[in-house]
Amino acid sequence: MIPDIRIEDYNYPLPDERIAKYPLAERDSSKLLRYIDGKIDEFVFRQIPELLPSDAVMVFNDTKVVPARLHFVRPTGARIEIFCLQPVKPEEYNISFAATSSCSWKCVIGNAKKWKGDILDLYNPENAPEIAEMAMKARLVSREGETGIVEFSWSGGYPFSRVLEICGTIPIPPYLNRESEAIDSERYQTLYAKFRGSVAAPTAGLHFTQAVLDAIRSKGLDIETVCLHVGAGTFLPVKNSEVAKHPMHREPFVVTLDFLKDLRSSGKSVIAVGTTSVRTLESLYYIGVSCIETGAPADVDQWAPYTREYKWSTEESLDAIIAYMEKNSLDKISAGTRIIIVPGFRFRIVDMLVTNFHQPESTLILLVSAFVGGDWKTIYDYALSHDFRFLSYGDSSLLYRRK
């Protein structure tokens, strides 16, 4: 049964001055709130290796934020902002980023009403030679509301990934209320980001430095990675009072066969770094169920965890994915998830969570509440009254799941 949840029950007062507009000078100097068995204490983030159990697996999302925000201009002079969401033609991220003359993407189009279908030129007010040489253009293929399919074309033989690096800007969250700056290219990106595709950072990972990662390894924890490309839906508030009416956007993810085998055999506690890692890990169970019941993986529906009973164990589910991959000689598996994690969700894989402090009335607050129960209010009250910084560039928390 889909839970009857009112989003107003997950509100809290967040003054604008508590939203971190910029990162601290050092990634690991942020504050860290630890919640375990109803108790709260605080540390500096660089102390996190001391707080973690050594017999655990720590899972990071190694997606990379792309400079997905582009500005074009009509012949009339009107500016049109185009925000790339996901590739359409070619559909695979790596192939689209490797394209050297054209590709099409699903995009959010700012000032959309002013784009009448004419071909746009990239906005280049300073006449930068490298940008001028590309002669980048945008053509509207189709439109649906504020989104549309846009075909980009350019000269010079550059791969599209390089085109974005030269012409685009990092799409920082709207609640920062500022334009993207040079510092964001470095700091709105995790140190271990590897695979391009996200339009928002998995911000729990922004605090990790090489020294912190080395200390975690030295303590004996297993470090693993998954890759979920974070979509623009991560910025969307829950607009309907009834959470059941909130649509989740599909986000693609990839996990490797080696990772699944390690996860299946370790028997250790699992620490997820960020809500995107949680959503990937918890989606795996339903991917495995699909392999058992239909013989193949399928995308995870938003309400799949709540609308039926599941008789399969987590071990059986993971075994089914592994068997499917081995049978088809796959070293990695790609799927999509719309999973929403709300109070009442049964966690099957994740035991601990590293995460920032999230917006009121957001799906991320619902996930935290599902993880720690009603104590989410106590945690957030503590953070507000103890000078913690909030949202993407804010401070961090280490949460133990309420058993």
Where do the protein language model's features map onto the residues?
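Surface-exposed, charge/polar-rich loops and edge strands
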Residues: 1-403
